[in-house]
A protein has these predicted regions:
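Aromatic- and glycine-rich peptidoglycan recognition patches
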Residues: 79-90, 109-158
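Mid-length scaffold segments of soluble, non-membrane domains
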Residues: 57-73
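Surface-exposed patches in mature extracellular/periplasmic domains of secreted proteins
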Residues: 5-8, 75-82
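N-terminal capping segments
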Residues: 1, 5-62
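Structural motif
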Residues: 94-98
């Protein structure tokens, strides 16, 4: 697993530069430094955007995908499917596609690990145990059994 600097923050959409600046002095926090991230909880998931802390800096899973896709704002895991097309098969995944469980979690596909296409390298923001942006190898069967769907951003160009 390779960790990237930015911390997870429920509802977060900070760029790496914004994250670093907010840790020094945060206008939303009266000039005091922002906290380096927070955690997602079932309560926050139920409350949605109303649970976003203005005192923490970072990015959440959908904010991470929204930044990678160069979108103008953070689109939630409930909104991202409207910007995407469903792929007929996991075998059609390409770099930059997503695996999504709407309302729960989303991650970016990078590449297959092996010819069997049962494991792949992906990138995500959160969850346990790291609570930050990270690349790691995922199990296709595990995600399929958990309800994840392969999708491609409508604005993606080959």
């Amino acid at each position: 697993q390779r960790c990237i600097r930015d911390r997870y923050k429920w509802g977060g959409f900070d760029t790496p530069r914004q994250f670093a600046e907010r840790l020094k002095a945060d206008a939303a926090n009266g000039g005091a430094p922002a906290a380096a991230g927070d955690m997602g909880t079932p309560e926050k998931q139920a409350a949605g955007d109303a649970a976003v802390s203005r005192f923490a800096a970072g990015v959440d899973c959908s904010g991470f995908v929204s930044r990678c896709w160069r979108l103008s704002r953070r689109f939630s895991t409930r909104e991202l499917p409207a910007l995407s097309i469903s792929l007929p098969s996991w075998d059609e995944l390409k770099t930059g596609d997503i695996l999504i469980a709407p309302g729960r979690h989303v991650l970016l596909f990078i590449r297959w690990e092996g010819a069997e296409k049962d494991r792949f390298l992906g990138s995500e923001a959160g969850p346990l145990p790291v609570w930050k942006c990270a690349e790691r190898v995922f199990s296709r069967p595990m995600l399929e059994n958990s309800g994840y769907r392969p999708m491609r951003y409508r604005g993606m160009r080959d």
